[in-house]
Amino acid sequence: FYAVATNIQTGEEMVFGRGNAGKAVRASCSIPGIFQPVNIGDKYYVDGGVVNPLAVDVARRYGADVVIAVDISSSFETAAPTGTVETIMRAIDIMYNKMAAIQFKNADVVIKPKVGHIGSSDFTKRHEAIMEGERAAVEAMPAINQIIAKLKQEGRLP
């Protein structure tokens, strides 16, 4: 398991692969302006998405032969944000979408649940998001099975 966070003091990407996994996960999803940076050692970390929203390159660097990514891009065809938090979240979503689009091209399979209408701060629709994620994963199974068959044919899987 690896978690990607951003050193808020230097702007550098940090990949956590050992140590306190709970702190690493907390740091990797600590959205700036919404959650406090997480102190690990003598450094402070925030959401890894600030510098690398999808981290396909990190997965490859750490040995992944196959990368399955999930596109949770937001739809911007909704009403304008009404408050400070909504505005911050929309700005983060826009940055995420632009940077993630580059990484999606490097993934082997991209699962695309239709959750763009659910805001990243809208926890009331989590069940809907989970169900849509399951539907999209099932839809992606033919592509995943194709990769599995190829790996078996190459002798890389039993």
Where are these regions (language model features)?
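Patatin-like phospholipase
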Residues: 1-158
